[in-house]
Amino acid sequence: MKTKLKFLKLFSIACLGLLMLTNCNQSAEGDDKKSEYKALPASTEFDLVILNGRVIDPETAFDAVRNVGILDGRIALITEESISGKETVDATGKIVAPGFIDTHFHFQAPVGYSLGLRDGLTSSMDFEMGCAGSYIAPWYEARAGVTQANYGVAVSHELARAMFIDGSDGADYLINGPIAAYTTRAKTGWSQTRPNLEQGNAILQEIDKGLQSGAVGVGSTVGYMRAGVSSREMFEVQKVGARYGRATGAHTRYTLGNDTEENNGAQELIANAVALGAPANVEHFNNPGWRLAHEMIIRLQEQGHNIWGEIYPYAAGSTTINAEFLRPEIWIDKMGKRYEDTMLDPVTNEYYTLETYKATVASEPTRPIVIFKMPADDEWKWLTLKGVTMGSDAVGATPYLAPWDFPMDSLGGTHPRTAGSRGATIRLGREHKIPMMQLMSILSYNAAKHLGDTGLKFMQERGRIQTGMVADIVVFDPETFRDNSTYDKGAVPSTGMKAVIVNGQVTVRDDVLLPVFAGQPIRFEPQDKPRFEPISVESWNATFSTGMPSDFSGGVPVPDLDHPESDKH
């Protein structure tokens, strides 16, 4: 394994220059092709045609039966005229919509992409856990040319803390991005310890390295680190992202919590973003108090702020058993829950007791669990919310690093949202008569819009069925497309998908995954220079004070020296 990782690192260095050149050319090429395709006649022989489908484009609210011609990986023509091509998808009676986009997909591995594709997922990112900054470039290079769906990752706040507080710096497993947390979470400093000034600057510099390398944004699991991460540290983390104009996505500070705590956590992320003039993604806010969280987000959008929120259509969540908010003094004493009713082991399909919880935390602290937290009747209501995005929070199944064609019925230990979030969305929409345009906005366009507004060219060309856009497309039966995964069997793929097209290539046809590897990196162009600015007492005083005493430390992520008791937990 170590030999393979070393090879990947060397390979990534060799390829980086070529890929940077390729990325630079994509934007100009895309603009040229948009103007070229506007003049294409229906007599053109296309690479692929999608015939007689109900075309839905959320950005323009277009909804009509049309034929779609695809050439060189882009939508070249949308027409009522007859067209032909080298390959055909008969979409009669089917929906033709933008490929689904997920900003919160942890299972960034070959079989994870396979599960997503069966569910219509053409583009996925991990905007919560992310990847350590120093490993962003090799993370992308390891997937180049061998990945079936589009892939992206944020730079990780949590893993930066693990590197400089728990000593994970330089560990080979960090190249695996979000999956690395199954190793780093065996220690506790990443979640419990407040850094000193030197450590704090190292954490922020590591985040900057990832953004310099093209990470889609900053991912923070502050809700798992509420004791260790001060409000100042969270602000400084978002400030690093703000220097690049990129979003911070966060599992907010008090998730899981009661309605007031949940919204206070969202308010921290949002207030920081507004103060910094930066984008933000309030992740999986479908928790207690979700109506207020949504209202705040929509009101800010109406004022012009690029702030958005994610939901997923499941009443239960999933995490590792040692999550801070699941400790007995919080989950039982404070929130009034019982492990016997709420905490399920997805491998054994048994509920925990206090005794088995304590034993498992001691012996296997990063064991995945399913946690029931909300009424099931709320699942469809979240799908009616204006402007939200689908963030499935898809977690890994075992074996995590299985090949793309590994038998899905042999995968274990995962939440049904990993395989079924999009199928569940369409099924619930069908059962509750939610307009298809709304569902397609949630599943595709809304994420593309918000990420595109951060300057991410990749997303400015996706999430839409329009001439000149990249041909990431799903074709599905609106009456039969559905999820099949359950809490008992979480990795059963969805069915009812006629075709999934990635960058113009059919990757799923009639619910069969094909050996097509057309996935492209969802990534900003790497920057020549870092934008990291170390923090210090002196720089804070010079900016915000006319003569602050030298022992004041309010501007750095260290304990308040005027009130040292504030650092005791």
Listing of model-derived features with the role each one plays in the protein:
Residues 81-86, 90-146:
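Metal-associated gating/positioning segment near the N- to mid-region
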Residues 2-12:
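Bacterial N-terminal signal peptides that target proteins for export
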Residues 11-22:
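Bacterial N-terminal signal peptides
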Residues 146-151, 235-250, 275:
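Alpha-helix-loop-beta-strand connector modules within alpha/beta enzyme cores
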Residues 155, 161-228, 266-274, 278-443, ...:
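Active-site neighborhoods of metal-dependent hydrolases
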Residues 24-66, 71, 80-81, 117-123, ...:
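Active-site microenvironment of metallo-dependent hydrolases
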Residues 106, 129-133, 226-230, 256-261, ...:
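Acidic-and-aromatic substrate-binding clefts and catalytic sites of carbohydrate-active enzymes
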Residues 99-108, 222, 248-254:
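Histidine-centered catalytic micro-motifs
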